[in-house]
């Protein structure tokens, strides 16, 4: 696939993004994402794992610490991201490469699993990427934020500022991957943990860490957890902040 599939503006934005790096914040978020990966794939063992869109390598850092797989690899579209990954000196990381966003520089069935964590919402041509990932790995694990809400189109600037150009619900993501010939193996919904919310509010946004503000964060988390637990799968998906799904490749895309 040609480099032209990824817009020059998108490439430049991510180069700049990782240059303005906040390691403490990214490590905190990555710890919970890595926990989701481990939990959803707990019934499987993987020897050779590739993370596509590996960012600064924070997820791989935790997966290495937890002995998730003996051999890890990373692909990232930004030079600054690659530099951050290399600087972490992750023991089980066998290779780090910059790539064009769509072409995976490995032969067919090279990996037991590919991880795509909080990447798909940024991808301009999502189906092209999914087909390439299916070529290279037996399993694919995707995590996306559940950004879609009623009136999401009125908040375009908010989401575009984060680079989120695709909106997903658990249902819409399942439809996407199954229509591309993947089989759903395991999945889970998750909420933003209060630890992450507190850091974002009081460190990133520099809000006052008042008792009321802390209580509100904790109450919202517990209330959403309770509603999801009591209301079944539909309510769990309604209140979720993120969705993680493990897929295996099954067949090629079939239309008509």
Feature locations, PLM:
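A C-terminal cap/extension of S-adenosyl-L-methionine-dependent methyltransferases
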Residues: 188-256
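Conserved N-terminal segment of class I S-adenosyl-L-methionine
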Residues: 1-107, 113, 130, 163, ...
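Di-metal (Zn2+ and/or Mg2+/Mn2+) metal-binding site signature of metallo-dependent hydrolases
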Residues: 122
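Short alpha-helix
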Residues: 165-181, 187
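Short aromatic-enriched loop/helix-cap "lid" or pocket-rim segments at secondary-structure transitions
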Residues: 87, 152-156, 196-202
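Short, glycine-/aromatic-enriched active-site segment of Class I SAM-dependent methyltransferases
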Residues: 143-166
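A short glycine-rich, Lys/Arg-flanked "PGG" loop and its adjoining helix->strand segment in the class I
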Residues: 127-142
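A short beta-strand submotif of the Rossmann-like class I SAM-dependent methyltransferase core
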Residues: 113-119
């Amino acid at each position: 696939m040609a480099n032209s599939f990824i817009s020059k503006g998108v490439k430049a934005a991510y180069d700049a993004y990782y240059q303005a790096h906040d390691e403490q914040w990214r490590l905190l978020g990555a710890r919970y994402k890595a926990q989701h990966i481990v939990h959803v794939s707990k019934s499987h063992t993987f020897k050779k794992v590739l993370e596509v869109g590996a960012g600064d390598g924070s997820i791989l850092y935790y997966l290495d610490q937890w002995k998730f797989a003996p051999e890890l690899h990373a692909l990232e579209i930004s030079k600054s991201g690659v530099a951050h990954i290399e600087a972490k000196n992750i023991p089980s990381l066998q290779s780090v490469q910059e790539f064009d966003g769509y072409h995976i520089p490995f032969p067919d069935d090279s990996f037991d699993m590919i991880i795509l964590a909080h990447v798909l919402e940024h991808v301009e041509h999502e189906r092209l990427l999914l087909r390439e990932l299916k070529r290279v790995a037996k399993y694919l694990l995707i995590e996306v934020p559940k950004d879609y809400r009623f009136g999401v189109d009125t908040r375009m600037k908010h989401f575009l500022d984060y680079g989120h150009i695709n909106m997903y619900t658990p249902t819409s993501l399942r439809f996407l991957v199954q229509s591309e010939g993947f089989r759903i193996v395991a999945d889970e919904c998750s909420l933003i943990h209060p630890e992450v919310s507190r850091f974002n509010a009081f460190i990133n946004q520099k809000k006052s860490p008042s008792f009321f503000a802390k209580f509100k964060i904790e109450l919202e988390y517990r209330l959403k957890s309770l509603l999801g637990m009591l209301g079944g799968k539909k309510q769990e998906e309604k209140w979720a902040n993120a969705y993680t799904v493990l897929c295996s490749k099954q067949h090629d895309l079939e239309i008509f």
